[in-house]
Amino acid sequence: MIIPKDKKWVQVNGSEVMGNLWASFNIDLSDNYGRLRIGQRLIVNTDETDDADIGVPVAFASINSINYCIAGSKVFKSGANTPNSNFTEDAISGVPTNLNSLYSDMASFNGYLYVSANSTSVYKTDGVSWSSFSAGSNTGSPRLFVQYADRMYMTDGNAKIISWSTSDTPATSGAYTLDLSSNADTRRITCMRASASRIWIFTTNLSGGKALVYEWDGASTQPTRSYRLESSGAFSCVIKDDIPWIIDANANLLAWNGGTFQYITGFNRENHKLLTGIFSTTNDRFVHPNGMSIVEGNIHILINGSNNDNTGTIEDTIPSGIYEYQKEFGLVHKYSFGLTKSNGTIVDFGQIRISKAGALSELNQPSTSSTRNGTFLAGAQIYTNAGSTRNVISYDDQNSTLQKAGTFITTKIQSSEVTEMWQKLYVGVKKFLNDNDKMIVKYRIEEVDSTQISCTWTSTNSFTTTSDISAYANNDEITVIQGVGSGKCAHITDLSESAGTYTVTVDETFTGATSQTFLAKIDKWKKIGSLSNRNASYLECPIGKSANWIQLKIWVTFTGRKEEIETLYLVSAPNQFAK
């Protein structure tokens, strides 16, 4: 059996058997169609270790060759228009200092950059100076922007929209305003976007019913039309080819088809739990209103994959980070936030679990700088250990300067008869470019739910935990999901227990691990082979097990852009025939 058949990798989501990818983490299927590469590492541009005032980055924009960001109460700007140019606080006279990541927004209009605060003031800059004016009367709720025709529109309160023209004179009632507040809890505005001929207004229903999407001409006092969603809300939107694409409360990707919002695909919620923050009255949800962007022509979505439960559990199929959608291969996890800066030591391969999701924006500006790097900026609040957080502004390492890692899990491969003897697996790869590059191959023939555990590093290859892991043993798998080592897998070589504390030794080295706390999950995946030989073009992995299905998992570290997994060859023969 050859995987993928017809050289086409596909992640359907919502099925264990359709397509050939069940789960992905840092996987790039668009860089070389038909081959599987690793998504470029997200490098930290600026974080709280550079400036303690940085909050969650929730908006990015560019004006006059300067990139701007709202992160907490302050405006930050870069020294150049490239994504890897570092951010510092804007210190020009009049710059606002009363912003809030839960409420504020940023957008360009009429040659200026407009910024909303948690007040009735609106601020604007041309990159040289700042000024402000009063608009609206409500505070304590998101003040979201959308520019349409020759006006800027802003939410004022939970269910009202005001606007102003190039003269910055606000219209607060009548023409060019909209008031949906007759039943505000069922029409709470979450996002606005403009296409060529209309404004799209997205809402959430906090009363538990279905939400509505409104179409508006920007001038009338009533919406042009309304459309009912099959969920309680829509939280983020991007316009592609003049069509709105949205993420709804069920973590589904929907697109306008001319008559309704049609289901395209969704995040693979194995346990059907809702994701974090869907009942929030601010912008603190699993996806931010500014969390979708068109990057190099494709839809990208930044999410917090944590479930909306007491402990914020995370499923194997929904790691946090940035996903890419294409019709050809579906919705795939491509990038994850990490702790590493461009000149720093690599101590993780991406945080599977994050605290808060922020903004995502393509800012692929032309530059002749020899150090230019990145095509987009992304913001989040991530974890540095089992509990501490750090706000980060990150960019994608399109120069492929740093090592990265990724994982994929195939769908269940069914036997051709009642049971199959799964004999061996060959994995074809492009020859490695670096001595530190590596591939580890695993399988399972029975499904056991993973266990999330809280741990403390004691060395670079050992840790302790008071979580009950008595059901696990040598050769079982550990994946760090939060803190130092996140995104890396290892297998147990020694496990002992004393007075309720387990001491675990693993077969991989976790650089930077000393005595930090971290979160991990433990599984029953069985390791069947590893490859680190730069001259090898394939790996042979013996299996020798009989079952009615098999699932494969591969974890790799690559350094260069063009390293890739080419093809899987699964060798098997029927074992038990149906008679």
What do these predicted ranges mean?
Residues 1-96, 102-112, 116-128, 151, ...:
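N-terminal beta-propeller domains
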Residues 4-10, 78-86, 90-92, 118, ...:
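Non-cytosolic beta-sandwich-type ligand-binding/adhesion modules
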Residues 35-46, 394-408, 448-454, 519-524:
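Short domain-boundary/entry signatures in modular proteins, especially
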Residues 50-52, 94-98, 134-139, 173-185, ...:
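Surface-exposed ligand/attachment interfaces on beta-rich extracellular proteins
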Residues 52-61, 96-110, 137-150, 182-196, ...:
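Repeated scaffold domains used in trafficking and secretory/extracellular systems
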Residues 85-94, 131-136, 171-181, 223-229, ...:
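Beta-propeller fold detector
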Residues 357-411:
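Blade-level signature of beta-propeller repeat domains, shared across WD40, Kelch, NHL, RCC1
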Residues 449-524:
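Small/polar beta-strand repeat architecture
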